[in-house]
């Protein structure tokens, strides 16, 4: 009863309890039947059972031995693979160490070469500095020193003809790209200040081809008035250095001539002093660029057709279009009187004075000022009246021919009375 209580739990429902009791009864019945069969079985069956058990044990042993051998083979194979893997890893490690050692050796060698090169450069720099210092000391001690002569192979320069525009005006529109040679003077009595004079009209000249209304923003009178202000502001500064015998300001519209200022002094020493004084200074928000100019003859530099308003190239002309100086100042230099022989006397001097009084500068600017007034219409009416009266034109033509004959006869008598070489040089 106690075993039954231990086998069957107490806290069960009635249905579960009955099922458990039936299960226990069946179990006991099977056990009982098994004991009876064991008692009734013959001894041969026991021998067969034991033989079967031994056979099963041998088979199990054989199977266990086979499995053990297979395991040994697998283990040996795994050990062999492990050894091969270790060898490969060791070889890779040694190869990596060898590569690192080579890289380190190459890096150290490269660093060594760099140090040697730096030391060599420092040594060369010290040697150059010592040589320069030695040359400076020698120059200070001897007071006579010059640069070493260039190699003989480099002394000869390929011949190139001189640029005529640079020699005449001191500027070339091609600049450094010019195929001809620019003979830059080392000393000259003429100083050139590039693009010193600037106005709104001169700066906007490039827009005329695209903006037809740009010229309405300025006029020639305003530009000339600005030039007069510039003239009275700048010229006294140049005169403080030395005697100025020519002062010209270019009104060209080409970039290489636009606003250039030409100042000719009486001597080259004064021009050198002006160059050292004005070069690099600031004026009107711009830094001045001064240089020596080869122009000493103004008759070949200034465009004569521009003075008569007949220049065919207009704003593309490469000769100087200059403003007229107030009161015709420096008019003697316009005809290169300072470059001519000082022995002109007699009628030749009178003729030169007469020609100077009839300067084309006055004609040009008087025409430009009268262009906007009514004089243009009056001259047009006069020409129309002359065309209507041919007899009057014939009469005036006869009078002019007679006056020319009188002047030519008078000039011939004056030439006969004047010295020959001087008059010939004046005519040429």
From Swiss-Prot:
Polar residues bias: start-end ranges: 419-428
SUPFAM superfamilies, A to Z: RNA-binding domain, RBD (SSF54928)
Domain of life from the UniProt record: Eukaryota
GO biological process assignments: mRNA splicing, via spliceosome
GO MF annotations in UniProt: RNA binding; zinc ion binding
GO cellular component, one term: spliceosomal complex
Biased composition (Basic and acidic residues): 351-366
Domain RRM: 189-295
Pfam families in the record: RRM_1, zf-CCCH
CDD domains to which the protein is assigned, alphabetical: RRM_U2AFBPL
Subunit-level organization: Interacts with SF3B1. Interacts with ZCRB1.
PANTHER family noted in UniProt: U2 SNRNP AUXILIARY FACTOR, SMALL SUBUNIT
Additional comment: Maternally imprinted. Active paternal allele is unmethylated whereas the inactive maternal allele is highly methylated.
Protein name: U2 small nuclear ribonucleoprotein auxiliary factor 35 kDa subunit-related protein 2-like
Species whose genome carries this gene: Mus musculus (Mouse)
Lineage: Eukaryota, Metazoa, Chordata, Craniata, Vertebrata
Gene that encodes the chain: Zrsr2-ps1
């Amino acid at each position: 009863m106690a075993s039954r209580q231990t086998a069957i739990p107490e806290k069960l429902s009635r249905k579960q309890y009955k099922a458990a009791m039936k299960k226990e009864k069946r179990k006991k019945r099977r056990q009982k039947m098994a004991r009876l069969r064991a008692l009734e079985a013959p001894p041969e069956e026991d021998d067969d059972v034991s033989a079967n058990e031994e056979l099963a044990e041998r088979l199990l042993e054989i199977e266990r031995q086979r499995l053990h051998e297979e395991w040994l083979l697998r283990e040996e194979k795994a050990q062999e693979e492990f050894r091969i893997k270790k060898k490969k890893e060791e070889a890779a490690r040694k190869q990596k160490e060898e590569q690192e050692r080579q890289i380190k050796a190459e890096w150290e060698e490269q660093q060594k070469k760099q140090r040697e090169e730096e030391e060599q450069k420092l040594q060369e720099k010290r040697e150059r500095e010592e040589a320069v210092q030695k040359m400076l000391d020698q120059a200070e001690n001897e007071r006579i020193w010059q640069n070493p002569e260039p190699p003989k192979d480099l002394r000869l320069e390929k011949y190139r003809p001189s640029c005529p525009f640079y020699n005449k005006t001191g500027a070339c529109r091609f600049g450094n790209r010019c195929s001809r040679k620019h003979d830059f003077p080392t000393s000259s009595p003429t100083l050139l200040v590039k693009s010193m004079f600037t106005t709104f009209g001169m700066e906007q000249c490039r827009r005329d081809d695209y903006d037809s209304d740009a010229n309405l923003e300025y006029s020639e009178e305003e530009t000339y008035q600005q030039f007069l202000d510039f003239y009275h502001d700048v010229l006294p500064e140049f005169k403080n250095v030395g005697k100025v015998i020519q002062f010209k300001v270019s009104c060209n519209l080409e970039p290489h001539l636009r606003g250039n200022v030409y100042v000719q002094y009486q001597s080259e020493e004064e021009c050198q002093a002006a160059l050292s004084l004005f070069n690099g200074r600031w004026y009107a928000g711009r830094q001045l660029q001064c240089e020596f100019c080869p122009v000493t003859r103004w008759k070949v530099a200034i465009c004569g057709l521009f003075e008569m308003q007949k220049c065919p190239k207009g704003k593309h002309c490469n000769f100087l279009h200059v403003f007229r100086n107030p009161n015709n100042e420096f008019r003697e230099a316009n005809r290169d009187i300072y470059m001519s022989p000082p022995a002109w006397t007699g009628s030749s001097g009178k003729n030169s004075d007469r020609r100077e009084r009839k300067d084309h500068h006055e004609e040009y600017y008087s025409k430009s000022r009268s262009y906007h007034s009514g004089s243009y219409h009056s001259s047009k009416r006069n020409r129309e009246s002359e065309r209507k009266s041919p007899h009057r034109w014939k009469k005036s033509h006869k009078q002019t021919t007679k006056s020319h004959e009188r002047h030519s006869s008078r000039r011939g008598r004056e030439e006969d009375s004047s010295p020959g070489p001087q008059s010939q040089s004046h005519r040429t």
